[in-house]
Amino acid sequence: MKVVFMIDGWFMRKRIYKLKTFFYDGPNIRRYCLKHLRGGDTLYRIFYYDTAPLDKKGHNPISRNAINFAKTIVAEEQYKLLESIKRTPNFALRLGTTAWKNNRWILNANKFKELLEKKINVDDLVDSDVVPWIEQKAVDMKMGLDIASIATKRLADKLIIISGDADIVPALKLARQEGMIVGLDPVRNPIAPELSEHVDFIATRT
């Protein structure tokens, strides 16, 4: 069977960082995917969906210090990751867009709780207690279109999704209707019922 993988990059990166399973780069992601292959399986392609770092400037609301988000350590790590994926065999990189939602910031949940409980006040907050409200756009759409194209053109026999997003359910239903075997790798994350309902098997290789 020809096997195609589709990876929600933001989701997988977050899970691997939490589990500390392996150094997160193109070659190691490829090795992880290959663990899913069984006798008679061949790798068709690994589609990786993500966004480039936010390319904007702003001011931290706590200190008012200027920030160039494209030059932060997090951004530099993301650029390195994307370059690594581009250089790794069998990968197809699909990039959506990164948006800063209304230039808003999100307060750390623990700090928010401490504020409500009056254990701290606003003057106790530091720059690292807030992060910009970042949204990924067009990632789910690109994944859905690729699933539909591969399924209808019979380019692969088995699809393995590494994601936790139930928004791709319509595309998974189409793939199964077209005769593909559909698997889900949640990377040990809880699975939404509507997602597990529309796959043939669930397996994690961590």
Question: Which residues are covered by each model-predicted region?
Answer:
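Nuclease catalytic cores that cleave nucleic-acid phosphodiester bonds
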Residues: L95-T206
